[in-house]
């Protein structure tokens, strides 16, 4: 019996809706990363993007445990001398709550070209409303 390898043309994609109200950031991000990758499907193939679309609502109400709101720091550098920028998780949650969840999920995806395609299937909204009602998303309980 040969191993089944998924082909890009044969992949069917579903839409899932995740409400992250009072859910822990890391636990939610791992589940979302698995769905984006397609690891929840029996047709999972590491070299093919078999994942589904994920819609995340209420991103501003996500929870972080411990003192991570004050202690967790995200760094970026502009490649110029003195160009190091840092922002705490608390400030990022106030300013751009979508970016906080996106950074967490991106860190859990593979570091290759396929990850950029997977990340495009992630739709994050800070409020409770989203414009994807026509896709009839299924609820994903986490």
Swiss-Prot record:
The keyword Ribonucleoprotein applies. It holds the Pfam family Ribosomal_L13. GO terms for cellular component: cytosolic large ribosomal subunit. GO terms for biological process: negative regulation of translation; translation. PANTHER family: LARGE RIBOSOMAL SUBUNIT PROTEIN UL13M, RIBOSOMAL PROTEIN L13. Transmembrane segments: none annotated. This is Large ribosomal subunit protein uL13. This protein is one of the early assembly proteins of the 50S ribosomal subunit, although it is not seen to bind rRNA by itself. It is important during the early stages of 50S assembly. Belongs to the universal ribosomal protein uL13 family. Part of the 50S ribosomal subunit. InterPro entries: Ribosomal_uL13, Ribosomal_uL13_bac-type, Ribosomal_uL13_sf. One of its GO terms (molecular function) is mRNA binding. It comes from the Bacteria. Keywords: Ribonucleoprotein, Ribosomal protein.
